[in-house]
Amino acid sequence: MDELKKAASRFRELIVGTPKNSLPISLQDFPNGSCGDATLLLGQYLAEQGYGEFRYYLGWRGGKSHAWLQSGSVIVDITADQFEDFDDPVVVSDRSPWHDCFAGTGQHIARIDVFGEQAKAVLGSAYIAILNSPK
């Protein structure tokens, strides 16, 4: 799990280092309000790095939604620190009571092409910019 956390941390660093004008609006205030698209992009990245496919999980707590990756019991989240009650920038864990509070459900495989060609074009451009980030 240490290698998975390193990969997730690396991807987060790449997002942070990417010029904002190269990112869609949904990622320009990362991690705030970025969990949906960041989760799809991270799922794509981890699959390409050989970690297999993850599911996109979506949950609600107190009127706020949150998305993260999950494969079996393994949770991967690079945007949880957008919430005031969570400080860790990267979560890779077999269990997370914090995520349990969202009562998330698996929606679909986390890839940049799950929402059709238009979304794939936008997320694909962002993905290329992120991978080419100077950070």
Predicted regions and their residues:
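A structural boundary/capping signal
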Residues: 1-135
